[in-house]
């Protein structure tokens, strides 16, 4: 192992003092050996959390998809009801138009009839 050499900090171009910088270990292998047990448990815990989070996200995604499909079905049913109402209204307008035409013809027929009666009475 190499001994750590004390280096006098050069503050001319530095924005922060050297004490705040993290020390660089002499050997990355030695520094990671002490951490291996704790980092392994942290990593396995993270994997467990990631798996649990992914499961929760999948469950939420399924619920959202179910709600969206239910909403789409509801909108489709309402659109079908609206279309049937439009068809009924169209039929009512056709029937009203037929009745109006019948009444116009009836009025014209009665007018002609009254004209004939009036002409007969005036003679």
From Swiss-Prot:
Q: What is the official name of this protein in its record?
A: Testis-expressed protein 12
Q: Which InterPro entries match?
A: TEX12
Major location category of this protein: nucleus
Q: Which Pfam families match?
A: TEX12 (PF15219)
Q: Keywords for this entry?
A: Chromosome, Meiosis
Subunit annotation: Interacts with SYCE2.
List the biased-composition ranges (Low complexity): 27-39
Protein's GO biological process = meiotic DNA repair synthesis; synaptonemal complex assembly
Recorded GO cellular component terms are: central element; chromosome
Source organism (scientific name): Homo sapiens (Human)
Q: Where is the composition biased (Basic and acidic residues)?
A: 7-21
> What tissue expression does the UniProt record report for this protein?
Testis specific.
Segments of this protein annotated with the region Disordered: 1-39
Subcellular location, record wording: Chromosome
Give the protein's function.
Answer: Component of the transverse central element of synaptonemal complexes (SCS), formed between homologous chromosomes during meiotic prophase. Requires SYCP1 in order to be incorporated into the central element.
